[in-house]
Amino acid sequence: MAETLTPRQIVERLDQFIIGQKEAKKAVAIALRNRYRRSLLDEKLRDEVMPKNILMIGPTGVGKTEIARRLAKLVGAPFIKVEATKFTEVGYVGRDVESMVRDLVETSVRLVKERKMSEVKDRAEQQANKRLVELLVPGKQKQTIKNPLELLFGGQASQPDNGHSHDDEQVEKKRRQVAWQLANGQLEDEMVTIEIEEQPPMLFDFLQGAGIEQMGVNMQDALGSLMPKRRKKRRLKVSEARKVLINEEAQKLIDMDEVTQEAIRLAEQSGIIFIDEIDKIARGKEVSGSADVSREGVQRDILPIVEGSTVMTKYGPVKTDHILFIAAGAFHMAKPSDLIPELQGRFPIRVELAKLSVDDFVSILVEPNNALIKQYQALLATEGINLEFSDDAIRKIAEVAFEVNQTTDNIGARRLHTILEKLLEDLLFEAPDIGLNRVVITPQYVEQKLGNIVKNKDLSEFIL
């Protein structure tokens, strides 16, 4: 189970995707393990143990967000990333800080719902296949009266059959044959007409911006249930229709009240909220006046959420006491001490992330499971091209990335995306027509494609 991973094992898992930043990985690994330790305590003490929130300090592109995202994915915890600059003080137009908790609960509901639907997938598939058989071999239509008032005007209700007719036996025989063909994948490309529930039109979205969202009420859900449900017909291949029907049947098999309760519990006990750009709402020396007051107001609004409070959502009240908050910022223009003292105290663990070196860039290019070079190799393999990079070429690319970051804005590892795209631009364009099955990238090729751009500072700023 991911919840029982030791801090060392968590760091090893994170190492598969993120290069360096040992201190930051260590801090989040301890925070995650402490959650597991807390779950083993008796209930009275468990409520007293609060998570130690983390403040990550470091330039953009060094792995702050990725560490938090991978951590959440590792344990299947609900995770959201928000930007502190998007929030406004209560009473002003814009998003209030409580919306981050509502977003977390939405993510949690989606996670739990997907998990529950995967648990009933086999049963849902059986029901979907039954419906497909009935659609492919429809039975004899019986006369039924949907409106009881028809009886007053001479209509007759359908009588139940006392036995099977010859036609019914033929239909059953045909259905058994079709069921066997479906099970053996012989009818995947056959066309079938299915009825699916149509989503009600989004009529009430305009109300959400008028403060309704802050009340924890979803007008679409509240008023949508009063509107009649419409069904529309779609003609699909059996393989596609099965997916639609499995989804419909799975929805019927899960209890949404149970999903909601579990989702709220998961968000409260395991949720992770990543607040980016928190340095932008700190009191910098160069900022004064109303903007400074507004920033401090947002900090004071964030404070009760981080301290622990109850937020109303459309799924019910959610306590934030045990949600793990990870804040991050570059802190170029401000210092962590420029945050209001109360908020500083709520982020007791501070980790400084190092700037990336040339060696870090080399490692980022080749070591992670999702390394950029591996991605480009996989993309070009679809065109029948075996793309290779010499070790010297990889180091040259890393040196170019480091140099451009030094001479222009430092955007960390994101610089590699721009550089590799520029380096391989011609190859990606010509790949379908080039007629080669092997291409080797050398230092000379890197110099040829990027050398002049790197030397010209103006070009670097615009192109790389």
UniProtKB/Swiss-Prot annotation:
UniProt subcellular location: Cytoplasm
Keywords tagged on the record: ATP-binding, Chaperone, Cytoplasm, Nucleotide-binding
Major localization listed first in the record, in broad terms: cytoplasm
Location of the region described as Disordered in the Swiss-Prot/TrEMBL record: 154-174
InterPro entries in the record: AAA+_ATPase, ATP-dep_Clp_protease_ClpX, ATPase_AAA_core, Clp_ATPase_C, HslU, P-loop_NTPase
Keyword Cytoplasm: yes
Biased composition (Basic and acidic residues): 163-172
The keyword Signal is annotated on this UniProt entry: no
GO molecular function: ATP binding; ATP hydrolysis activity; peptidase activity; proteasome-activating activity
Chain's role: ATPase subunit of a proteasome-like degradation complex; this subunit has chaperone activity. The binding of ATP and its subsequent hydrolysis by HslU are essential for unfolding of protein substrates subsequently hydrolyzed by HslV. HslU recognizes the N-terminal part of its protein substrates and unfolds these before they are guided to HslV for hydrolysis.
Similarity annotation: Belongs to the ClpX chaperone family. HslU subfamily.
PANTHER family according to UniProt: ATP-DEPENDENT CLP PROTEASE ATP-BINDING SUBUNIT CLPX-LIKE, MITOCHONDRIAL-RELATED, ATP-DEPENDENT PROTEASE ATPASE SUBUNIT HSLU
Record-linked HAMAP family: HslU (MF_00249)
Name under which the protein is recorded: ATP-dependent protease ATPase subunit HslU
Originating species: Geobacillus thermodenitrificans (strain NG80-2)
Lineage of source species: Bacteria, Bacillati, Bacillota, Bacilli, Bacillales
Chain's gene name: hslU
